[in-house]
């Protein structure tokens, strides 16, 4: 949980709303982020002891874009170690449960992003997909997962698995939410997000 940041961003969104200056449909919406997106001043370890203590100085570009759209960075989520497991397993940071069966694995590698949405902790989680890491946990947790075309969203500030295949994508409850989030991650202006 990025408590101080989340609180500050939520308060700023509330002030904008009160003043009639909302940035768009995602202004004030809390979003969870897979632990491979650089987050300024917050450990970004990709679920691995190998990267323990890695604290980036700036946000990943997709996080900057989402913040500019008014989203609230709720915190970082569990993931398969170094994004290398379609099951969502991680012996280093533990494995989150599957919403449909607490004894089942959630799918991965964006396991925590899926769990955060499936258990109603956030309306959207941001993950990465190289070989199914958004699609698998979305399917296993009754969510919508959007695997974007390689190159559509920036990988700047994203810990890579296979840079030529890696993509960034949202895990949400609805197709409409995924489409809105895609626009925010791209850096689209709010008007471009409307119908």
Identify the residue ranges that each predicted region occupies.
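Glycine/threonine-rich beta-strand-loop-alpha-helix active-site module
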Residues: 88, 130-156
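Short, solvent-exposed loop/turn segments at the edges of secondary structure
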Residues: 92, 108-111, 138-141, 148, ...
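A short helix-breaking turn/cap at a secondary-structure junction
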Residues: 147-195
